[in-house]
């Protein structure tokens, strides 16, 4: 395992990753998994690709009922070839507003479950698949080698 600390940087030097949701996101359940894919290569200052385009990304979101948005601040995991990269990140929309704005489309979900989400969180928030967003990385970055399925 390899771990690095990314020092606090000025706004223009913060590492930002353009992403797209791989499936719809909603607050039907308390735990809100966000599955995404990196839209473009993330290149470090030395010119090396740190995270390739197409890398799978997993994070956790939560509902902000007042704003009608899905927010996420915390751990995100990137899966790139044989590495698992864990980072602290904040989710921003394309206009650099924190979180993803929800829509009214419910994807024919059980209306009782939607009512439960409204009762629990104060709102039902749905974000469609293929929604573009930005992850702003900060703090610690941990890189872990994943074992091969073909090695003993």
Give the predicted meaning of each segment:
Residues 11-73, 77-79, 125-126, 140:
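Structural recognition of beta-strand segments within beta-rich domains
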Residues 15, 42, 50, 71, ...:
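Generic detector of leucine side chains in alpha-helical contexts
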Residues 48-50, 56, 84-88, 134:
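Well-ordered beta-strand positions in beta-sheet-rich domains
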